């Protein structure tokens, strides 16, 4: 077990995912400075807020997260940092500690199980095709809507904006399952379920079930 600085957010970072942050709260500015002063690569944990807000504290936080390694950090001025981090590995949160002076938790690394399951690469390719199709549907629906309806559509898939950018994934089948979970046009609650899946096989099965619902909703919007 290890104590790790934590950054709870209303979104889910997965291994291999990129996390840009604009840090302005004093407690998180202190956290960034402490992480940069620590030995080794500067990193912190990221976890999903289930209820509450990102600023001010008093939020409820879930118990599976991802370690975020800081790649770029820029002090915009004495009160703000801009940083970019990448998700490196999954963690299980054993206990949330007092926010003193910023959120911290007792965590363990939580590696995936059955990472060498037979046929995993084939299943990844099939899921990749489904994710691409769902993203194309989401882009088609988005193109038909005005700004207010796009907000409604984002709410319908979980409150996150629709990403229509690059959809390439890793050649490593395990990391690719996380990339697919990041790319899929789904909301943070479903993305968290995929993060918490025991291994890549379960993650792909769950992703297929989630995409069934997403595709049905998008096709309904097009009908």
Which residues make up each language-model segment?
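N-terminal low-complexity, acidic/polar interaction/targeting segments
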Residues: 1-223
């Amino acid at each position: 077990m290890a104590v790790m600085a934590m950054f709870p957010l209303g979104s889910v970072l997965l291994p291999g995912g990129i996390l840009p942050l604009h840090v302005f709260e004093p407690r998180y500015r202190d956290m960034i400075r402490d992480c940069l002063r620590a030995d080794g690569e500067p990193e912190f944990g990221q976890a999903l807020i289930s209820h509450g807000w990102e600023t001010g504290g008093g939020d409820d936080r879930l118990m599976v997260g991802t370690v975020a390694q800081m790649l770029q950090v820029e002090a915009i001025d004495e009160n703000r940092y801009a940083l970019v981090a990448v998700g490196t590995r999954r963690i299980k949160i054993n206990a949330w500690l007092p926010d003193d002076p910023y959120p911290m938790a007792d965590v363990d690394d939580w590696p995936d199980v059955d990472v060498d399951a037979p046929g995993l690469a084939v299943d990844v390719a099939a899921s990749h095709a489904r994710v691409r199709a769902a993203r194309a549907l989401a882009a088609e629906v988005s193109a038909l809507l005005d700004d207010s309806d796009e907000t409604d559509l984002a709410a319908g898939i979980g409150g996150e904006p629709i990403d229509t950018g690059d959809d390439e994934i890793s050649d490593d089948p395990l990391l690719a399952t996380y990339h697919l979970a990041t790319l899929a046009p789904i909301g943070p609650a479903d993305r968290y379920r995929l993060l918490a899946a025991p291994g890549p096989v379960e993650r792909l099965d769950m992703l297929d079930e989630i995409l069934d619902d997403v595709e049905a909703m998008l096709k309904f919007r097009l009908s």
